Amino acid sequence: MPFKSLTLAEIRSYEQETVEFETGENLIFGPNGAGKSTILQGLFGGLFQTNITKKEVNNDFNLPELVRKQAESGRIELAFVVGGEEFTVEWEIKKQFDDDGEVTGAQTKSGYPKLSSPALDESISGFNDVQDEIQRIIGMDAKSFVNSVYVQQGD
């Protein structure tokens, strides 16, 4: 399952960045703090809406921390190919504020995450429906994906 591209808008250290992936192997490297882990979070979070940087795969994203401090909302868009068909999953996150302007939390915007493809009769939206469809398309769940393709730092 090759990744085609990843767009991060107002996510962690990225104001607006699109990473285009080449066919075959791609190397992500850079100094500490350059955003390598954010790219991995974008890839994995885009597919499964879960956090890959923890030892256990779970839904423990700290959504307010994903969105840049200066921004009110952020967006992840991931394009990937399965069986010759391209799929795009979009995930938008909006911070929530109290009356004093302090961040109190965050949630996915209405209608997100969203999965679209010419291979689908119509776009699919909503956390559970998108997650179920992606698992069906790629033939594995988040835990199986991590165990197949990802090595944690320090492992």
Describe the residue ranges of each PLM region.
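Extreme N-terminal "head/tail" segments of very large remodeling/mechanoenzyme assemblies
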Residues: M1-D132, R136-N147
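Short, intrinsically disordered, charge-balanced linker/junction segments flanking boundaries
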Residues: N147-D155
